[in-house]
Amino acid sequence: MSFVKYLRRDNLLQLAGKPSLSRNYILQTCRTLIIETSPPEFVKLNRLSGSDSGIIEVNLDRPVTKNAINKEMLKSLQNAFESIHQDNSARVVMIRSLVPGVFCAGADLKERRTMSPSEVHTYVNSLRYMFSFIEALSIPTIAAIEGAALGGGLEMALACDLRICGENAVFGLPETGLAIIPGAGGTQRLSRLVGRSVSKELIFTGRKIDAIEAANKGLVNICVTAGEAHEKAIEMAQQINEKGPLAIKMAKKAIDEGIETNMASGLEVEEMCYQKLLNTQDRLEGLAAFAEKRKPLYTGN
């Protein structure tokens, strides 16, 4: 199975036989990102069932390195999200850590020391494309953060639509202290989320911030008692899962594509997304359920 990379583009293109993933990314085979063998299970998928069917947990589990992402863990991430992309029943994705006290410590710097500049270039590009893949999923993504989310770990959380953290969470992009910069989307996504000035301060200084400051700056959506981020993320995923799945996809598309352009163009995107929902069975089901004062049963059609 081959992984994919994204190239920036103004117009939307459709991947043959698959739904478009995002506003201005196109999929292209990337030879440098071929998954050659089954990697160790550093990333484990958990598909919830029953009334929670459609919610998928992506569990990070590399305790020896505090979930630092080496080549093998990156392959595990690629496998996991390729599987989610292929799953038509997926409605909400949540990324969490199974390692107590840490979300993700970033890249594996011990492995990095053994790499040539060319190998580092390939690895960082692969990580950047991986996080762009997460961002470009048509369904909502939630990061449930306990403990440290540093470097590439924070960049992974930034690629998600929503972030929920425990009070014990710590955030930072310390790369300038290593004479490099955040290379997996941090300079771009952080700036778009918290603003240019705050982003520059955090990246220039490499300063770590706690959960309360992160919430005040808008870096996270919700801060809860330590140890309760997963529970809160499940609650939010359940709320999303109850809504019309096509509507959720179109809402994400309208917001993500519209925010990158001017108001007039953004309203055109909104109109296009709304139009796509008018002839769906789910829209009729929503109206019928409202009239009959019952819970709607959405099928994604």
Curated annotation (Swiss-Prot):
Its EC number is 4.2.1.17. Belongs to the enoyl-CoA hydratase/isomerase family. Substrate binds at A105, G106, A107, D108, L109, G152. The keyword Lyase applies. Gene3D superfamilies: 2-enoyl-CoA Hydratase, Chain A, domain 1 (3.90.226.10), Lyase 2-enoyl-coa Hydratase, Chain A, domain 2 (1.10.12.10). InterPro entries: ClpP/crotonase-like_dom_sf (IPR029045), Enoyl-CoA_hyd/isom_CS (IPR018376), Enoyl-CoA_hydra/iso (IPR001753), Enoyl-CoA_hydra_C (IPR014748). Residues 1-32 form a transit peptide. It catalyses: a (3S)-3-hydroxyacyl-CoA = a (2E)-enoyl-CoA + H2O; a 4-saturated-(3S)-3-hydroxyacyl-CoA = a (3E)-enoyl-CoA + H2O. Keywords: Fatty acid metabolism, Hydrolase, Lipid metabolism, Lyase, Mitochondrion, Protease, Transit peptide. Disulfide bonds: none annotated. The keyword Protease applies. This is Probable enoyl-CoA hydratase 2, mitochondrial. Pfam families: ECH_1 (PF00378). One of its GO terms (biological process) is branched-chain amino acid catabolic process. It comes from the Eukaryota. Pathway: Lipid metabolism; fatty acid beta-oxidation. Its main location: mitochondrion. It is found in: Mitochondrion. GO terms for cellular component: cytosol; mitochondrion. The record marks E175 as: Important for catalytic activity. Straight-chain enoyl-CoA thioesters from C4 up to at least C16 are processed, although with decreasing catalytic rate. GO terms for molecular function: enoyl-CoA hydratase activity; methylglutaconyl-CoA hydratase activity; peptidase activity. Transmembrane segments: none annotated.
